[in-house]
Amino acid sequence: MTMPPLTLYLAAPRGFCAGVDRAIKIVEMALEKWGAPVYVRHEIVHNKFVVDRLRDMGAVFVEELDEAPTDRPVIFSAHGVPKAIPAEAERRNMVYVDATCPLVSKVHLEAERHHENGLQMIMIGHAGHPETVGTMGQLPEGEVLLVETVEDVAGLEVRDPERLAYITQTTLSIDDTAAIVAALRERFPAIAIPRKEDICYATTNRQGAVKAIAGRIDALLVIGAPNSSNSKRLVEVGRAAGCRVAQLVQRATDIDWEALQGATAVGVAAGASAPEVLVDEVIAAFRARFDTTVEAVETVKERVEFKVPRILREPAETP
């Protein structure tokens, strides 16, 4: 039987960023150093495939610190945690490893610096997302105001419009954030801006890669988890760039083939916590149904690497 022809455009960069790669290594190295179980507060990264693999290796995922026993190591997820969490771990004499992405930690330090200078913070982010919760939790209650949309800016009640600074979640839509920043600067001309863009290089690059293929494709598949902020933003970027069909899928089994009927060119992108093995799985699913040509479209090369914490590079103490 002759299969219909189809071109798959693979957006690059895609998949693991340096922060995700580091966080996964931290769990693997902790298991190697201390043995199982090692506890992880919240999913280390937002990807079921990754979490399930680490669980099989002996990681135990919990949502709150008090679910972890005091005599086993605990790891904080890549998204970051409020200051109260490591303080509580220290109070309980727990061994803990902070897997917060260094680019998220940079935003935390920025917030603290502005706070020390007497500025009230405005955070652009998604309510309830672990990264937003962690960043807002670096400062005392009420010191960080959250905005999610341009409309939110008009309703902000600030202490002093002359003493403000803004920070952002690292995984936002670049275009949406630019609109919110413009609204903030219009309403509060004196607002202090970040020294360097808070939205991370990987988020920026993956959104740019989707825009680069959008004009060539009939549909877009983004491989990522439904609770992954950066993956959901890729779907939105694709739609905004004119992709009539844009699906978020965790695995090849999630693909809505009916929605792809008549498509001859499909784009494939992957969120920052999606492993390349899932991309390969999607390509194989297309090859089973179409005479598939695969074309990689790379917009930039990524060479960022982050070191794991010193505690994991030191040998385990012998009793």
From Swiss-Prot:
It is an enzyme of class 1 (oxidoreductase). CDD domains: lytB_ispH. Dimethylallyl diphosphate binds at H46, H79, H129, S228, S229, N230, S273. Its cofactor is [4Fe-4S] cluster. Isopentenyl diphosphate binds at H46, H79, H129, S228, S229, N230, S273. [4Fe-4S] cluster binds at C17, C101, C200. (2E)-4-hydroxy-3-methylbut-2-enyl diphosphate binds at H46, H79, H129, T170, S228, S229, N230, S273. The active site is at E131 (proton donor). It catalyses: isopentenyl diphosphate + 2 oxidized [2Fe-2S]-[ferredoxin] + H2O = (2E)-4-hydroxy-3-methylbut-2-enyl diphosphate + 2 reduced [2Fe-2S]-[ferredoxin] + 2 H(+); dimethylallyl diphosphate + 2 oxidized [2Fe-2S]-[ferredoxin] + H2O = (2E)-4-hydroxy-3-methylbut-2-enyl diphosphate + 2 reduced [2Fe-2S]-[ferredoxin] + 2 H(+). GO terms for biological process: dimethylallyl diphosphate biosynthetic process; isopentenyl diphosphate biosynthetic process, methylerythritol 4-phosphate pathway; terpenoid biosynthetic process. Its EC number is 1.17.7.4. One of its GO terms (molecular function) is 4 iron, 4 sulfur cluster binding. Binds 1 [4Fe-4S] cluster per subunit. Keywords: 4Fe-4S, Iron, Iron-sulfur, Isoprene biosynthesis, Metal-binding, Oxidoreductase. Pathway: Isoprenoid biosynthesis; dimethylallyl diphosphate biosynthesis; dimethylallyl diphosphate from (2E)-4-hydroxy-3-methylbutenyl diphosphate: step 1/1; Isoprenoid biosynthesis; isopentenyl diphosphate biosynthesis via DXP pathway; isopentenyl diphosphate from 1-deoxy-D-xylulose 5-phosphate: step 6/6. InterPro entries: LytB/IspH. It comes from the Bacteria. Belongs to the IspH family. NCBIfam families: ispH_lytB (TIGR00216), PRK01045.1-2 (NF002188), PRK01045.1-4 (NF002190). Catalyzes the conversion of 1-hydroxy-2-methyl-2-(E)-butenyl 4-diphosphate (HMBPP) into a mixture of isopentenyl diphosphate (IPP) and dimethylallyl diphosphate (DMAPP). Acts in the terminal step of the DOXP/MEP pathway for isoprenoid precursor biosynthesis. This is 4-hydroxy-3-methylbut-2-enyl diphosphate reductase. It comes from Cereibacter sphaeroides (strain ATCC 17023 / DSM 158 / JCM 6121 / CCUG 31486 / LMG 2827 / NBRC 12203 / NCIMB 8253 / ATH 2.4.1.) (Rhodobacter sphaeroides).
